[in-house]
Regions:
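Active-site and donor-binding regions of nucleotide-sugar-utilizing enzymes
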Residues: 2-83, 90-104, 113, 124-128
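Hydrophobic/aromatic residues located in beta-strands of well-ordered beta-sheets
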Residues: 22, 89, 119-120, 176
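Short gly/ser/thr-rich secondary-structure transition/capping motifs
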Residues: 28-32, 73-75, 139-144, 158-160
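Conserved acidic residues
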Residues: 46, 87, 155-157
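Active-site regions of enzymes building and remodeling cell-envelope glycoconjugates
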Residues: 62-68, 87-88, 136-145
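Donor-nucleotide binding loops and adjacent catalytic segments primarily
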Residues: 98-154
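A donor-sugar binding/catalytic signature common to diverse glycosyltransferases
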Residues: 146-180
Length: 180
């Protein structure tokens, strides 16, 4: 991930340690944009570990690239078999302070417009109570959850900050609105 940092690092490592193995895990989405990174990845890295099955198609050196699976598929243990009416709506305003500051006020307004539901605010497990009070402010309208997968599975719908959480919701089977 983060090719803006990792590609220059791989280049520097290759120049400094020409015989060392350089493994790149979670490849940049060169299939979507900036395809020129493919040649750089193949030049600087000895092994490319893909989390998306079709990524190998854009690389010329098939010996360097291996599909290793997606880490979320290992983490998520339960999936929805069908859509449910649990009367629970999940809200995930992100994990960065700016995301939370931008999205939480909107989510609080949404709560007022979607009556007769239980509103689940999913907060990253790493956040302590002091940080939560400081960053989130009044969240008394919400039930708090720090278990993303369980909360998404139990919710009939979610409003989610753009990022990995949208993939989690899609894999679990919870319909959502991507928020940015």
């Amino acid at each position: 991930d983060s090719s803006g940092f990792n590609l220059p690092l791989a280049k520097k490592l290759r120049a400094t340690y020409p015989t060392k193995e350089i493994i790149y895990y979670i490849l940049p989405q060169a299939w979507a944009w900036k395809k020129g990174r493919v040649a750089k990845l193949e030049k600087y890295c000895t092994k490319l570990c893909s989390i998306i099955p079709f990524e190998s198609e854009i690389y010329t050196d098939k010996n360097k690239i291996t599909y290793v699976g997606h880490p979320l598929l290992d983490e998520i243990k339960e999936f929805k078999n069908e859509l449910s009416n649990t009367n629970k709506i999940a809200f995930m305003p992100g994990s960065r302070k700016t995301e939370i500051n931008n999205l939480l006020p909107i989510f609080k307004e949404l709560v007022k417009k979607i009556p007769n539901k239980e509103y689940i605010l999913i907060i990253p497990a790493k956040f302590d109570e002091e940080y939560i009070k400081k960053i989130y402010g009044d969240i008394s309208a919400f039930t708090i959850s720090k278990n993303t997968h369980e909360a998404l599975k139990d919710s009939e719908y979610a409003f989610i900050c753009s990022g990995t959480a949208t993939l989690e919701a899609a894999l679990i089977g919870t319909p959502f609105t991507l928020s940015y």
